[in-house]
Amino acid sequence: MNEAIVTRALVKRYGRHAALDGFTLAVPRGSITGLVGRNGAGKTTWMMTVAGFVRPNSGDVSILSRGPFDAAVHAGRFSILPQDSELPNEGRVRALLVGYGRLQGLSKKAAAQSADALIAAFNLSDKANSPIRALSHGMRKRVAVAQAFLGEPEVVMLDEPLSGLDPVEADRLRAFILSRRERTTIVVSSHQLDDIERLCTHVAFVADGKVERMETLRALTSDTGRVAYTLKAAPPGVAALEAACPGVRLVQEGDVVYAEFGDDLSVDAVNAALLPRLLEFGVLSVHPGRSLSDAYLGGLSLR
């Protein structure tokens, strides 16, 4: 099979409320799949169900084609960062990670090597022997995320991994996640659509306990009739630019200019006409297609 995780028609009820109401999703192996949805949509419940912390009322789960989570089968191959995960206050960073690695089935030597590599990757070397209680919220979050990658598991699920991180450490974590692309299947739940768009190869829109739409990021955001130009300085207006580019409608939102055009024009042709005129304002990025936010807010999942 080409799927790392498959869930079919999962239902989880709490009294009359269905936290999962037919949640069906196949996560491709080697993908970074993002879950997008409102609070209470079912993202966290689905993750906890896949991880074996929550028992569904009905439906099927299979991880790596080996059925639902079983520690004897999946230890060392599957891991999770739960939302708002707590770490023992008196545990020391390196010792804690080594211990978690041992629980994943690693030898003492392998657990120590993996812990040391992750401590360095997450910029925690100067805190390796510090107790958790002495760490800031952001540092605790980095330790919690690091434990999910101990021993190079095949599947990692991350629930809000970037929340609570400062911009520098958030960027470091994004780079780390991207470095695992293809060799590790990663599922990320986040309310920050920019993060999902920067990280993910696939995206699932979740609402009312089910998946409304699952596509590649490219399929969700591709649109040959639109290009977004992010500029260092906002132009005083777009009328002159528009006059110089027949067939192109320009919309300005602060320092971003959107070009909208028909099928008779290509992205390359529009770039050739506009970019020379935008250079004086400093072009920071050129993004063909619509944003993930546009795709999500314009879809059924806004219900």
Task: List the predicted regions and their residue ranges.
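Catalytic Walker B motif of ABC-type/P-loop ATPase nucleotide-binding domains
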Residues: 156-160
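C-terminal coupling/interaction segments
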Residues: 264-303
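Conserved ABC ATPase "signature" region
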Residues: 98, 102, 110-127
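ABC transporter nucleotide-binding domain
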Residues: 172-262
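Conserved ABC transporter NBD signature motif
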Residues: 59-74
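Helix-to-loop junction immediately C-terminal to a conserved catalytic motif
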Residues: 51
